[in-house]
UniProtKB/Swiss-Prot annotation:
Superkingdom, taxonomy of origin: Eukaryota
Composition bias, Low complexity: 321-335, 382-398
Protein name in the entry: Cyclin-T1.2
UniProt KW Transcription regulation keyword: yes
Record's function text: Regulatory subunit of the cyclin-dependent kinase pair (CDK9/cyclin T) complex, also called positive transcription elongation factor B (P-TEFb), which is proposed to facilitate the transition from abortive to production elongation by phosphorylating the CTD (carboxy-terminal domain) of the large subunit of RNA polymerase II (RNAP II).
Amino acid sequence: MSNSNKLIAEKNGSRYGRMIHPWLRKKQDMLADTPSRREGMTYEEELSKRQQGGVFIFDIAMQLTHGKGEHGLSGVAATLFNRFFNVHSLKRCDFRDVAAACVFLAGKNEDAPKKLKYVVTQLWQFKYPHNKQFQSEQHFLDQCNVVTLIEDVLLKTISFDINVDLPHQYVLKLMRDVEKGRNVYKDMVKTAYYMATDVLIITDWSVRYSCASIATACVNIAAFFHNINMDDIVPFELSDRWYRLEDQSMTREEVEAMTKEFLDIFSRNPQFHIGSLKKIDPLGKVKIVGMPPQVSSTVTPSGSSSNLKKIDLESYKGRPKPLSNSSDSPSTRPSFLPDVKNQKVVEQELMEQRMKEAAQQKIHRNGHRPSSSSHPLHHHSTSSSASNNSNHQNRSSSGLSAHQHQKPYNEDSRSAKRSMMYEETNSSKKPRIDYKMSFVASSSTTIATMHNDHFSQTTHQQNISTYARGVNEMMLNQVAPPPLMSVSAQPSTYQKMCMEYQRNPADSRHTMSSTQQISPPDEPSPPVSQILLPPPPPPPILPPRLDEMEEGELV
């Protein structure tokens, strides 16, 4: 057996040793004197803040562990959280930042460290649910600095006493001694194990009771929810001392007091529990008196059972209205469905519909009829204006015929429209300057008139302001700017050389040598007479070698 296993066996299965400092306090002391109490906060307000911090810790742990190992991480972090606020007041700092620092330190303590950026990201998302993204990188760095600073303060506050023991292992050991291998209370064991995490989060028992005492209370609470009496399921020899198996100082009265306190918190604060109330209390033995949990569904069932029955069409049309405060007697609700069984009613409705259609057609026909007396300024003297007027009449007549026959426009009518609209495609296009717009002021309306020459519109000069007339005259009398003076560029050296070569064509009769070199255009070139160089000398004649000479040949 290794040394670590020997140490665990000597500590009766406990992973950690005893706490260095006496963190456990009695409830009377916490009611009388705590840092938050000195700041004017009551015990109920302090307990509510501790519960909010515990739920905040569990939410962050669930996101970081993805549902694997959240009980150990959240239990250690909640214990560190309660120890911290036994020394500091809840009014001095934000409990959410302290909760994130406790999670960060608990990950290191449980040999499962979490990265700081993940902890800070989850802290920001739960702290600001409506703005889950950091505004800038500086906000992220500032929040990281806050968490690390609180972690240092937390370590100094608890004097590096990070030996946090959890009640979960004591729950399993106690149920193993009670069942004696029967394995018939699996659901009760699961509930007790879940309660070991729940009580650390929604109560301050981690700084009031030992882990063995908390485990005993969790087993008794689970037995209460499952309607089981512990004295009936324990062996006969353990019937009077089963609650002292893990903690010799526990009494039956203390176990009952802890159970009653948890049930009171359970009934007054159901929103702080980390699980479903139906799973915790399947039999509904505890009456909820506090704020009920939020229901996701917004549909409320109707109180009348008649609405859930299937009825025929006649009953649906003539069903009575529900009773209201204004009227004492029920009245028949008017139906929006036509009575198809009565032939007279159907014929009457058809006649009314036809009369409405005829009235609409008459109004439409009167609205599109051209009147020459009402608008004398709309007459045009050119063929283009006449063609436009005829096109408008054709469109209105075609629209009337289509409305009378209740038929949509076909492709022939559309093609006819296109031909009339684009019949002057070969005409010359007017320049854009000729299209000048102006308005003629009538008695109450402004009528736009388009002339046949350049489609201009006339207006009264008195309607134009003085500033507008001045701007118009300035634009008309504006003198065109003088043309830019042409600057003669001096010829480059290369251009001068080419010009000189063109003036002296006799130099081109000389044959150019292979070694002739012409300077680049940017550099000053020598005269053309110096460009032609003499040919290179002939190669030297070497005497033949001795080994290549034949016999009898003279050197």
